[in-house]
Amino acid sequence: MPPTPILILDGGLGTSLQDHYNITFSSDTTPLWSSHLMISDPKTLLSCQRDFTTTAAVDVLLTATYQVSPEGFQRTKTPSHPSGIPRASIAPYLRTALDVAGQAVQDTSASVALSLGPYGACMIPGQEYSGKYDGEHDDEEKLWRWHTDRLGLFDDDEAMEGKGLRERVKYIAMETVPRIDEVRAVRRAVGSSKGFCEGVPFWVACVFPVEDKDTLPDGSTVDEVVEAMLLPVEGGATPWGIGINCTKLHKLPRLVGLFGDAVERLLREGRIQERPALVLYPDGTQGEVYNTATQTWEKVQDKSGADDSRPWEVQLSQVVNDAAATGQFSSILVGGCCKASFNDIKRLREQLRPE
């Protein structure tokens, strides 16, 4: 069996900006969160993203667009847009985000992935850990329309500088999805944006924040999630990769095993024909938990994974190597999410690719 290729993804952009560049965020003043820097401070954004491409030497860098949405821009008040940034004025900022990522990977071998979070990441307070959405976005059809509309923001000559999407990015990342109906909705959004997204592989990564349960916040099992990710969906595109992000590291060994088992079952039953890539980027937290009410990271007594005192990168590299050894995935893309710094990713790369 040939070895499974392993690629390195970057870490948590928002928390890196907070922890290493003293940037502060709040839903009142920066409703776009880390995406706000494409408006306020592209230079600092570039420095932070370069930390990942130079020091950490990642293979894939996510754009600073995770929280992008028409609603988020409308809530963002600037001197030139004191009442909020209208839809007609969004494109130049998206171009800035793509340009900054492009500059960060310049003179490196890294590629860019367009980062797109779930609807819950654009709510105030954020609901990507709960999946508790408002009535206007509470089923697959409504979420499909929202995601299609959000993708449409990028399908703009000014945002793309007249280029196709695949000239600007190598991947699309649909991230931190907490609901099974939203998994299907994002696949349909990519499918219905076929002309724009054509030729750009995408991944869907879900969040598993419920302690002692291997389910999404909506109760969906891994088997159900993998089926929603890979089985035919009317009008939906098939992802290149499936996986897990924004989830505690100690949950990964079991979850990855369940993902692999689900893939094997679908192959055995003839319901899928190809192995997907596995995409993993767990939180880099050391006991901190994000409080959506106070919008801060708080240290809590968390014994859930305390029996493993090995460094984050050692634990994660073992999960990756174990998954690679099964041959269940076509390749593995691994990095970090919240609180994972460029130094963490550098150490992860050194674990997986010792010189």
List each model region and its residues.
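Domain-level signal for soluble alpha/beta catalytic cores
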Residues: 1-355
